[in-house]
Amino acid sequence: MPKLTSAQIKTALPAVPAWKKRSATITRVFVFKDFPEAVRFVSRAAALAQKAWHHPDIDIRWNKVTLTLTTHDQGGLTEKDFALARKFDALPTARGAEPARPPGRGLAV
């Protein structure tokens, strides 16, 4: 699968709005009610990744799971990354996960 051009990436990103492009990757933080819920999500995500034979970088921090996708052998993003991102997005919906919100700026006085 060929590496996507900048224009192709820009076109693909709206289909995965919770994912953020960072360099040659796309990343999403999923937030769950607790650690066991986060781990259950990771287990389901791992099964999807194994089936697709495309494995994300996974970081678990208590109730937050960060998934990062790139296609290493192509040196950047491919349609494979966006297809798997869409599959991951379908997992937490039924379990109530939400995208992480950026930290606020605090209260203005």
Listing of model-derived features with the role each one plays in the protein:
Residues 1-16, 21-109:
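Charge-rich, low-complexity N-terminal segments
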